[in-house]
Amino acid sequence: MTVSVGLAGDWHGNVSWAMSCIRRFAAQGTSTIYHLGDFGLWPGGTGNYYLKTLHRACDHRGIDMFIVLGNHEDYHQAAAMHLDAQGWLFLENYPRFRFAPRGHTWVDAQGARFAALGGAGSIDRNTRKIGVDWWPQEELTQFDCDRLVANVNSQHWPRVDVMLTHDAPAGLRRFGMTARPAWFTPEVEDYCAIQRTRLRHAMDEVLPRWLVHGHWHDYFRDSWDGLSASGTDYRCEVLGLAADGMRGNAVIAEVIPGFGLGEITEFLP
């Protein structure tokens, strides 16, 4: 049995764009949205308005949203979240939203195996202020990756069907900076690159059939021919989603247990 879900890339707290996506998902009969990070978990009144507005829209339409946190998120607010019985984090006033801890795994109602590994480095972190618009907890650590591998191994999964991340793994051909802004430093580039390498190594351990990510603000499809940690070849299909205001930010995808994703339909809000 298969089911279709919504997949969305970075929204950056953009209320009008996010609302357009939610309306379009609902119009297609989608009741589950997986968000790939830089969702818009922000402090203060602006952040609260964003959460309230989107939650009201989801609740009215019977939509549940499962969110992988990115790098541009308020991690102080995330640290205060509660943990539910299924291992998801949540904010008390927003029961339609669930946030994936780093390394979280779950099986959907149809039996598809999912894993989530959020976080990424901010290449522009030197232009940001800690605790205001940058949080060091954005970093994807080795501990996060080890927890993912342990969670998958504890369930004896031969492969993960769909892996949801914010960043893209190292090794994808088309990623890399072509310009060097004035604020750029090699140290920060290394900080970001090592996280992508950690992500790739975690991927080689859990062997996803599909990996879906955001962060790079580009709609991207590719096939990954990888080498597992045990030395065997494997293939993973990779889908990167664009950001708010861009084509390829949101898609509807068929989820197939034991296969990953089937038909993918891109739409413009």
Regions picked out by a protein language model, each given a short descriptive name:
Residues 112-192:
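Active-site-proximal loop/helix segment associated with metal-binding centers of metalloenzymes
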Residues 57-64, 92-97, 154-160, 198-211:
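A structural motif corresponding to the C-terminal end of an alpha-helix
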Residues 8, 14-109:
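Core catalytic region of metal-dependent phosphoesterases/phosphodiesterases
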Residues 1-6:
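Extreme N-terminal starter segment of soluble prokaryotic enzymes
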Residues 105-108, 204, 218-269:
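Binuclear metal-dependent phosphoesterase catalytic core
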Residues 7-10, 33-38, 64-72, 99-101, ...:
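Active-site neighborhood of phospho(di)ester-bond hydrolases with catalytic His/Asp-centered motifs
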Residues 12-19, 40-45, 69-79, 105-107, ...:
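Active-site environment of divalent metal-dependent phosphoester hydrolases
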Residues 29-30, 113, 159, 207:
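Short loop/turn motifs at secondary-structure junctions
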